[in-house]
Amino acid sequence: YPSNVLSTTGDLTDEVCANNSMTPIEFSAEGGNSISISVSPSIALFNENITLAAGTTTFTLNKNVPTNVTTTTVYTYTVTLTGNANCPAAGTITGTITVNPNHNITLISAIGTDSQTICYNTGLTSITYQVDQGASGFDFSWDNNLIPPGITHAVSGTTYTISGTATSDISVATNYSYTVTTTGIAIGNICATETVTGSITVLPRQAITLASASTTESQTICEQTSIATITYNLSKGATGATFSWDPAYDGTLGGITFGLNGSTYTISGTANANITSSKTYGYILTTNGNTCSSTTVTGTITVLPDDKITLNTANETQSVCESTPIDDVVYTLSEGATGYSFSWDNNSI
């Protein structure tokens, strides 16, 4: 009777990534025709009993390895040949398959931090990823090489953090998208890496700029005269503005109008104030628009009263004889008047 002999010229030590096939190994069998295959730790689909057909003396071991390994695991398999009970059992071969896990990356900061919207010059809620299983590092890139100034990214062990403050004084909302790809174990480039993406949208600040002459923002006029038109331009995140009179000053100035036309805000009109002393009216203009902080500008309009002179006696026109004193004619200065000049008409004194 021929002896039970099992042999192979294949490599009995293999290393693969999860969810892949082992390197096929061809075995030769002599004497017996019953093959049993087992593995430890047990893999259900790996265990098998094979009966070789008559005249067949070879078979190939080619199995898929587990998909759910999270750490590198060594599996020891045993191939046993039986069948010729009259001969010594000499048909056992063992080998090992080292299975490496595929890569895994997980967002460990709050849900939604990987895609967030922030305002100019405000801090980003830190975005943190962690790798495990077959991954040990990161490749990071900003898509289209569009990099947000002030935002940084760094590795610390198995975590990757994106943080910082958006410092680019942009004019329109700008989206910065990024890609993070794991690095680590790679057997013949077949260990599956994992990629995550995210985005940071930066909103521009609400901007308002004086467009009229610098002297118009705080000006002085006389009552019942027109102010020099004050004009502001809205830009970036500002789409509108709210006007109010500053209560810290002298109240509301009648006759002044204000309004928005496109992106231009205009303050104009005639100071309709009946005042007896100088008054200063302060105004506040506050932007609105996107969700970023509003911007406020202020100015003042100082209104001066007209000069006023009042006759206090009833004898501004009188007739007297020569060398006779006149009755006193008395005038009072008020409101804007602080002095006087006197002249005789036609130089007749």
Task: Give the role of each language-model region.
Residues 1, 89-100, 190-203, 292-304:
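C-terminal edge beta-strand
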Residues 2-10, 102-112, 205-215, 306-314:
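Proline-enriched interdomain boundary motifs that mark the N-terminal boundary
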Residues 14-21, 115-123, 218-226, 318-325:
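Short, solvent-exposed loop/linker segments at the N-terminal edge
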Residues 21-28, 123-130, 226-233, 324-333:
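A short beta-strand segment in extracellular, disulfide-stabilized domains
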Residues 31-37, 134-140, 236-243, 335-343:
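Solvent-exposed loop segments of extracellular immunoglobulin-like
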Residues 40-59, 139-160, 242-265, 341-349:
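Low-complexity "stalk/linker" and mucin-like segments enriched in Ser/Thr/Pro/Ala/Gly
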Residues 60-71, 161-172, 266-276:
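Extracellular/luminal low-complexity segments enriched in Ser/Thr/Pro
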Residues 82-88, 183-191, 287-292:
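Short, solvent-exposed loop/turn segments at the edges of extracellular beta-sandwich modules
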